[in-house]
From Swiss-Prot:
It is found in: Plastid, Chloroplast. Disulfide bonds: none annotated. One of its GO terms (molecular function) is ribosome binding. It comes from Nandina domestica (Heavenly bamboo). This is Translation initiation factor IF-1, chloroplastic. It holds the Pfam family eIF-1a. Coiled coil: none annotated.
Length: 77
């Protein structure tokens, strides 16, 4: 059976080496996020200040996988 995961939204607060980021979730938790392979393959750039969707395991809630970068409402893209 596939492992159950929680999906949260959060804000990238800090960029760390090797594709790792410090993410502040909407519930004010601070966790360590790493970039998923699909985002890495698509060359999607993630910077501090971006809003992301992050998938968190029920067994280790201090780490998560960034699965989607949300569009900023104030950008001109």
């Amino acid at each position: 059976m596939k492992e159950q995961k929680w999906i949260h939204e959060g804000l990238i607060t800090e960029s760390l080496p090797n594709g790792m980021f410090r993410v502040r979730l909407d519930n004010e938790d601070l966790i360590l996020g790493y970039v998923s392979g699909r985002i890495r393959r698509s060359f999607i750039r993630i910077l501090p200040g971006d809003r992301v969707k992050i998938e968190v395991s029920r067994y280790d809630s201090t780490r998560g996988r960034i699965i989607y970068r949300l569009r900023n409402k104030d950008s001109n893209d």
